[in-house]
């Protein structure tokens, strides 16, 4: 679970369109990985959470993983 995730310094790079980036912040079961594990700041983690939730609502990402 302790995988190294590279967080971009530019906060504009974190949005719902960058699904490749925000998929790294989701666990195998489809849950958002906590801030203490990803080592991201509070501000960046809020942006990541918001982007994941927006992508799920639009349909770019699934709410649950299929194999669970």
Curated annotation (Swiss-Prot):
Name of the gene encoding the protein in the UniProt record: rps18
Q: What is this protein called?
A: Small ribosomal subunit protein bS18c
Q: Which residues cross the membrane?
A: none
Q: Which GO terms describe its cellular component?
A: chloroplast; ribonucleoprotein complex; ribosome
Q: Where in the cell is it found?
A: Plastid, Chloroplast
InterPro entries named among the record's database cross-references: Ribosomal_bS18, Ribosomal_bS18_CS, Ribosomal_bS18_sf
Record-linked SUPFAM superfamilies: Ribosomal protein S18
This entry's Gene Ontology molecular function terms read: small ribosomal subunit rRNA binding; structural constituent of ribosome
Family per record: Belongs to the bacterial ribosomal protein bS18 family.
Q: How does it assemble?
A: Part of the 30S ribosomal subunit.
Q: Which residues, if any, are the signal sequence?
A: none
Q: Name one GO biological process term.
A: translation
Q: What is its main location?
A: plastid
Q: Which UniProt keyword terms apply here?
A: Chloroplast, Plastid, Ribonucleoprotein, Ribosomal protein, RNA-binding, rRNA-binding
